[in-house]
Amino acid sequence: MENRIKRPRVDGECVKSINNGEFDRWDVEDTVAYLRGEGLQEWAQIFKDNGITGAGLLCLTEAHLEKMGVSPLGARLHILHCLQKLSQISTEPMKVFNDPIHGHIELHPLLLHFIDTPQFQRLRHIKQLGGTYLVFPGASHNRFEHSIGVGYLAGCLVKALNERQPELFITKQDILCVQIAGLCHDLGHGPFSHMFDGMFIPKARPADKWKHEIASVQMFDHLVEVNGLEAVMLHHGMRLPEDLIFIKEQIAGPLESAVLDQSQWPYKGRPVEKSFLYEVVANKRNGIDVDKWDYFARDCYHLGIQNNFDYQRFLRFARVCEVKGRKHICTRDKEVGNLYDMFHTRNCLHRRAYQHKVGNIIETMITEAFLKADPHIQIQGSSGRIFTISSAIEDMEAYSKLTDHIFEQILYSSGPELSEARAILQNIICRRLYKCVGQTTSETNVDVSQEKLLDWAKELARSKPTGTEGNLIAEDFVVSVIHMDYGMKEKNPINNVHFYCKNDPTKAIKIHKKQVSKLLPERFAEQLIRVYCKKTDDKSLEAAKKYFVQWCMDRNFTKPQDGDIIAPELTPLKQDWHAREDEDEEEEEKHRQNQTLPHHTPQRTGRNVKVDLFQARGETKL
């Protein structure tokens, strides 16, 4: 009878760490002890020789084992089966969603515990593009489906890096944390998305520097606590509190105050060796992240605008390279043009949809209605306390009840205290909107505050041209300043992107704009200044347009596109405007002359010259 090899018992500490889901903290000896305990002592030495620690166990595939020297297929499969027992993460069935953008997508069951909570389901009732839906009828999608898409794409990118570079030792816990961060990155959005944090809160609470990313972290903590998800996370092999810290850092950046020494690693959730993981969901370095990938595809789909960026191609070429001691996600050098196209797509979306002049004024009017209704709306929070729309951000239980429904709550109210707010929303529904009287730009970017906008409205009221009928006051004007950029204000985001070449995929390089094309933008940011008039009768609008042209002249802003039409008696008075137009015309005339001049044709005064291209050198026929 064949002698059976007695299976040695696994060390007690090793068993305890398995039960606690902390096997990724094992050193090489712990790994060897576990393998021997599973009857794999024949192959334990190979793991020891290759220096495999617990952090790398779940990253191993059959191909990795074969390269390490585990030749028999049966042995490789046996080892993989034993490694999978370390965590339930790789053995549980996935949940399938049918998404109109990404098709059939799979999400880990742990993610469902986050999705199936009131705090996450709240995102079903917050429009992704806020008031833009009232301009683009197809833009009816919500933060809910966008968040699921970001969670899915986050997993796609990290898994692609793991398959391409197993030496990164990306664990299943890493993948889950990145997916959860993608899933929960927008939990803090308020009614009508960016209208709430970009327009309403700055006016309702001007002293506060509130951002929806901070609210997302607070809502995430609230979600985990009230739904008892810490125990669920531990059951799925997560490490607490490190993984919770890591998830929140991906959403809002370092949780502690900024580190003065830039060389010091500011994050606590993951070590500097895994710095690239912080570039997946919200890439603070260059803005290339899965959040953009999803909203590009999803917003374009619902807006009816062509999306020119293919994230699938980026996934194919993404890899991690080390730069100055930190690891960054890089892409192939030949993809630099596609990345410029990506940021150009972002700019086009802002121009055509996100900053649409009608969509913007609708959100301005909604903001005005919310400000008037703010003291009269009561929302119950924790411990029975009552909050208003603007103070609900202080209490996550109250904030979780704040969605786009507040619009209908005001619109369908009957109390006299909400009459002013109700009237504004009724005007929106009936399309009685404030009218845009013009748009201009400044030669240099202006630091804009709420006080500056109010001062400009007062200046407009004083800019009445001579002979203009009607009187307008500051309260009749709304001044809006829109910032257009490539995502990093005046900076070129591609300057913060690293690439690699086919010849050496381990070395990161930078590619200057001049190496790509001479047709790329010289500037990466500008300001658009729009003026609206609240009075919508023809006489007031005609006067407001003349006020606006005069104000642009006084402020030395660019001439409005229709300035010569709406105020032909004013624009000739601004010499700078016409000097620029004369320069443009002279430039065009020179270009036209260069195009019409014959090339390589001998000229002689007073006589026609005919050239025989096939004549002998030195002969001329006249």
Swiss-Prot record:
The active site annotation covers: H212
What sequence ranges are listed for the domain HD?
143-296
Annotated residues for binding of Mn(2+): H146, H185, D186, D291
Q: Which gene encodes it?
A: samhd1
Which major enzyme category is it?
A: hydrolase
Keyword set for this entry? Allosteric enzyme, Antiviral defense, Chromosome, DNA damage, DNA repair, DNA replication, GTP-binding, Hydrolase, Immunity, Innate immunity, Manganese, Metal-binding, Nucleotide-binding, Nucleus, Zinc
Query: What name does the UniProt record give this protein?
Result: Deoxynucleoside triphosphate triphosphohydrolase SAMHD1
Q: How is the cofactor bound?
A: Binds 1 zinc ion per subunit.
Q: What is its EC number?
A: 3.1.5.-
Look up the domain of life of the source: Eukaryota
Name the PROSITE patterns on file: HD (PS51831), SAM_DOMAIN (PS50105)
Residues where dCTP binds: Q128, R143, H189, H194, K292, Y295, D299, R346, Q355
> What is the protein's known function?
Protein that acts both as a host restriction factor involved in defense response to virus and as a regulator of DNA end resection at stalled replication forks. Has deoxynucleoside triphosphate (dNTPase) activity, which is required to restrict infection by viruses: dNTPase activity reduces cellular dNTP levels to levels too low for retroviral reverse transcription to occur, blocking early-stage virus replication in dendritic and other myeloid cells.
Q: Which reaction does it catalyse?
A: a 2'-deoxyribonucleoside 5'-triphosphate + H2O = a 2'-deoxyribonucleoside + triphosphate + H(+); dATP + H2O = 2'-deoxyadenosine + triphosphate + H(+); dCTP + H2O = 2'-deoxycytidine + triphosphate + H(+); dGTP + H2O = 2'-deoxyguanosine + triphosphate + H(+)
User: Which Gene Ontology BP terms does the record give?
Assistant: dATP catabolic process; defense response to virus; deoxyribonucleotide catabolic process; dGTP catabolic process; DNA damage response; DNA strand resection involved in replication fork processing; double-strand break repair via homologous recombination; innate immune response
Which positions fall inside the SAM domain? Answer: 26-89
Question: Where is the segment annotated Disordered?
Answer: 571-622
Query: What regulates this protein's activity?
Result: Allosterically activated and regulated via the combined actions of GTP and dNTPs (dATP, dGTP, dTTP and dCTP): Allosteric site 1 binds GTP, while allosteric site 2 binds dNTP. Allosteric activation promotes the formation of highly active homotetramers.
Which CDD domains does the UniProt entry name for this protein? HDc (cd00077), SAM_HD (cd09508)
Q: Where does dGTP 1 bind?
A: Q128, L129, R143, K292, Y295, D299, R346, Y354, Q355
Name the protein family.
Belongs to the SAMHD1 family.
- Report the locations given in the UniProt record: Nucleus; Chromosome
Q: Share what the entry says about its subunit structure, partners included.
A: Homodimer; in absence of GTP and dNTP. Homotetramer; in GTP- and dNTP-bound form. Interacts with rbbp8/CtIP.
**GO CC terms, sorted:** nucleus; site of double-strand break
Instruction: Give the residues the record marks as binding dATP.
Output: Q128, R143, H189, H194, K292, Y295, D299, R346, Q355
Q: Give the binding site residues for GTP.
A: K95, V96, D116, Q121, R124, R431, K435, K502
